[in-house]
Amino acid sequence: MKHVIMLYFIAAATLFSSCAKQDSEHRLITVKNSLDLPRAFETIEISKSDIQLHTGERFEDFSIQDVATKAILTSQFVDEDQDGTADVLLFQPELNPNSEKQFELVKVDGGVEVDSTVYCYSRFVPERTDDYTWENNKVAFRTYGPVAQKMVEDSLPGGTLSSGIDAWLKKVEYSIIDNWYAKNDKDPGYYHIDHGEGLDNFHVGSSRGVGGSAVKVDTSYYISKNFTDYKTITTGPIRTSFILKYADWDANEKTISEEKHISLDYGNNFSRFEIHVDGTDELSVGLTLHDNKGEITQNVDQGWIAYWESEYFDSELGTAIVAPKGVMTASEYYVTSMKDRSNLYAQLNVDNNKVVYYAGFAWKESKQYPTKASWEKYIQEFSEKLNTPLEVSIQ
């Protein structure tokens, strides 16, 4: 039995050598790269339904082995429907340009050591009002919940009324979320100062931050309030994912219902946003312009917009939105006198009440993409890989 799967782009993999028990039935996975680019940090998803399990076999007992090298790859199981059993197995191969590799599902010995460090992490943060914050080894983000909203509406200090996406500018690979919040609790303002790991000096306010959504009616943009509920799906070495729910909101007498399914994979500077939305056939997603001094680069036909701030707190910062080809229909450099409401917007087609896009950033101090040119090269290659996904067959 053979399945062919076209997979969307995102994530990373580390190789480890080990001994594996060979099953009597080989389950081979072939991954093909048809681009003239090396491929890494892209997540392959193997669904439990793709594998014919025999009586007594458990999906969770399998690992991924490189057929040629016999190395065991880092992998992660995900219980997507939260029923207590894994639905998907994730791994991240590395492929040369125009090449293919074979992998096998194997049962490894109990003593095999595989890196299971939780680089991709997210959680609800009740101790800091009620943020939801997420990160991988490259970047971190957060957004704001109902308590923060109510504090503003009740004129209490410390609240935030925003559905924008905040950027936490980390410059270390390890997880910083818990540490930053703990130290900020003891020393208020701690994470607004760089102590060697990075900082949060990114102003969101009511802007869209890095990829927040809006609905445009005539010449005006309408936005939701804070998220009202959340569900964490997974954290691990390859992916974190979660769901944010929002109360219905008004866009010039149009009722908008919105739910955000967000994931962030290892090795990527972009979060993936899958928005489930009713009430509109077009969604606008934006990048804050801050003081409007940045440079815009875009290729709407290819599905991306970018903003580079060369005078960002004695450093430089780039943000971007990327969508699959054909989803982005236009962009708008929207400047207004309303505080925090100036954004670079991408207009995205909603198909069957759903739209997918990616939003992220690069900070010069992280040394990941320290120049405008290197950031735009990454965006262009990300877009190319997104539109030419790795081909995966299972037999």
UniProtKB/Swiss-Prot annotation:
Protein name: Uncharacterized protein P7
Lipidation (S-diacylglycerol cysteine): C19
Locations listed in the record: Cell outer membrane
Major localization class: membrane
GO cellular component, one term: cell outer membrane
Function field: May be involved in ulvan degradation. Ulvan is the main polysaccharide component of the Ulvales (green seaweed) cell wall. It is composed of disaccharide building blocks comprising 3-sulfated rhamnose (Rha3S) linked to D-glucuronic acid (GlcA), L-iduronic acid (IduA), or D-xylose (Xyl).
Keywords on record: Cell outer membrane, Lipoprotein, Membrane, Palmitate, Signal
PROSITE patterns reported in the protein's UniProt record: PROKAR_LIPOPROTEIN
Topology of the protein relative to the lipid bilayer: Lipid-anchor
Lipid-bearing positions (N-palmitoyl cysteine): C19
Naturally occurring in which organism (per UniProt): Formosa agariphila (strain DSM 15362 / KCTC 12365 / LMG 23005 / KMM 3901 / M-2Alg 35-1)
Signal peptide: 1-18
